[in-house]
Amino acid sequence: TKKVMDWAGFDSLEKMRKASTEMLYTAGNFYATVTGDRTGVVTGRPIVDGYVSLQSFDNAAYADALPNIPYMIGYTQDDMGDMAPGIAEFCLNRESVGGKAYAYEFARPLPTDHRPNVLEGAFHSSDLWYVFKSLKHCWRPWTQGDWDLSEVMLTAWTNFAKYGDPNGPDGGEWAPYTKDNASFMLFKLDENDQENSETGDPIPSQNRRFPF
């Protein structure tokens, strides 16, 4: 916040408080684009206001006030910070109250042609292309391996929505994260499958819809 405040020319906290939400988000994102410093990006977080939000998520979890349902929780390899410890703690919390939580890490760096101002790596939200099997709506040079990975993830998420278990009714290898099974399901391409892991042909430009 201090970086954006100084960079945007706010010389007092009072002036910054008077700025519109749109201006603060624009300033933060512009700062990150120009400087390459992603810590300047303004992100929104829930605030306990006693009206819409009565308590923090952490407090609700520790008080066993969360719905008694299975959970799926994960992060991407190049996400916004190290998410693994918090995810592990949440899963153990669910175990302590008799619940289940399935943890995952998405570790497929998205294929790219290295154009300017395009995110690279397994960045935050990059897993959604695979979960919803919407690869065809993106310009990136997907390989057959990407399509195969997307099918695996789509099936797991669909099973979880339908059965509360990403493995489906017949079971599988994705076990809940517990004290005795402290492991994340890892989603990535098979490095041994060179044909499907290498960068494939780009999708025609007329089919490119999103910059990320």
Model-found features: residue ranges?
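Substrate-access "cap/lid" subdomains that shape
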Residues: 1-93
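Mobile gating loops/cap/lid regions near enzyme active sites that modulate substrate access
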Residues: 29, 88, 92-212
